[in-house]
């Protein structure tokens, strides 16, 4: 055989191999495409599932044009505020156990008013409770523009959530546009979903937690077990809710708001370590008792960073207070909490929330401060 014969055979062998390689490559391409399709399908299922869960949340129509932000905020303040996501957290005393009952005018007060400020870069969270009995200016921003100077808790009662948000913005120079509001059932369920929390209970709290347990059980239809011991105690959902409601036994509303922030902190820390099964249980039980203005996309973005959130500040507003039992133009005698110089307290607030030194409040805040001083005669 000559060289040319071998050459022909080699070429024939090469021709016979090529179709096999093409078939193999085509099969791998098909497998890859199929795998990508499966992954996309799974992603779509997960998105559908999560969005479906989020749709359980009550989203009443909110008139964003009726949410007031002080126009006199200067450029530096606006720039600072844009670095944070500020949300108003509201706890309703609604006796109506339905989520629709959260937004009924003339029925519910916001016993818990908490400013949650999230640093968009560091994910640091700072919580400041506005004491419910603090005298602030609020108005019917959505309709009549009627103005009242009364307890902060009354804004929601008289005029609704737009008024409550606007009250915080105009009195404290903030830019809040969104809120999350829960009833007692939501708090009960979320604490139960994370497996309960451990709280230090003193003698006064032991008495009052059981008093509030009876009332909370009556109004929610939930069964409960009395707390028996002082010291470090493991509380279930309804016990933790009763703990958050305590106003007596020392510390009044100041101590109560501290309890509320403590419970939030403990729940967040436990939620960060929840497995998917428990997280799903929490979603199922809690979302049906929440009202919010946040859209699905915003909630998903916030949820993505849950593990990164760290609550680094927990305090109350105002920091310097005084008390009166009457206000000019207010016919009822009530225990009012006054910011001892509202403008000075707002300066402190901006340091606490945003690390701004020597903040100069807007003329609006200074005018409100002057009016409260005249109505109360306290400073």
Feature locations, PLM:
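N-terminal targeting leaders characterized by basic, low-complexity, disordered sequences
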Residues: 1-21
């Amino acid at each position: 055989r000559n060289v040319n014969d071998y050459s022909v055979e080699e070429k024939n062998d090469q021709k016979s191999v090529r179709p096999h390689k093409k078939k193999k490559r085509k099969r791998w391409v098909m497998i890859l495409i199929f795998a990508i399709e499966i992954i996309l399908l799974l992603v779509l299922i997960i998105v559908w599932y999560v969005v479906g869960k989020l749709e359980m949340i009550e989203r009443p129509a909110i008139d964003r044009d009726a949410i007031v932000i002080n126009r006199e905020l200067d450029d530096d303040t606006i720039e600072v505020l844009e670095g944070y996501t500020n949300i108003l957290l509201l706890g309703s005393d609604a006796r109506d156990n339905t989520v629709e009952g959260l937004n009924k005018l003339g029925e519910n007060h916001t016993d818990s008013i908490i400013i949650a400020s999230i640093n968009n870069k560091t994910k640091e969270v700072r919580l400041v409770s506005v004491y419910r009995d603090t005298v602030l200016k609020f108005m019917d921003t959505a309709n009549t523009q009627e103005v009242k100077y009364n307890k902060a808790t009354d804004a929601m009662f008289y005029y609704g959530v737009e008024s409550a948000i606007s009250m915080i913005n105009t009195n404290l120079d903030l830019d809040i546009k969104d809120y999350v509001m829960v009833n007692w059932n939501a708090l009960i369920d979320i604490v139960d979903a994370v497996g309960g929390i451990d709280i230090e209970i003193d003698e006064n709290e032991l008495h009052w937690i059981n008093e509030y347990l009876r009332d909370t059980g009556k109004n929610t239809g939930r069964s409960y077990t009395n707390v028996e011991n002082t010291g470090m105690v493991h509380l279930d959902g309804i016990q933790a809710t009763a703990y958050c409601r305590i106003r007596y036994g020392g510390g009044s509303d100041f101590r109560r708001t501290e309890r509320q922030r403590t419970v939030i902190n403990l729940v967040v820390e436990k939620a960060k370590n929840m497995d998917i099964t428990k997280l799903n249980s929490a979603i199922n039980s809690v979302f049906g008792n929440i009202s919010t203005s946040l859209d699905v996309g915003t909630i998903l973005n916030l949820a993505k960073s849950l593990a990164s959130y760290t609550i680094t500040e927990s305090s109350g507003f105002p920091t310097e207070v005084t008390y009166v039992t009457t206000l000019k133009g207010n016919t009822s005698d009530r225990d009012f909490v006054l910011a001892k110089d509202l403008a000075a307290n707002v300066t402190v607030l901006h340091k606490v929330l945003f690390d701004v030194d020597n903040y100069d409040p807007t003329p609006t805040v200074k005018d409100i401060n002057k009016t409260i001083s005249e109505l109360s005669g306290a400073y």
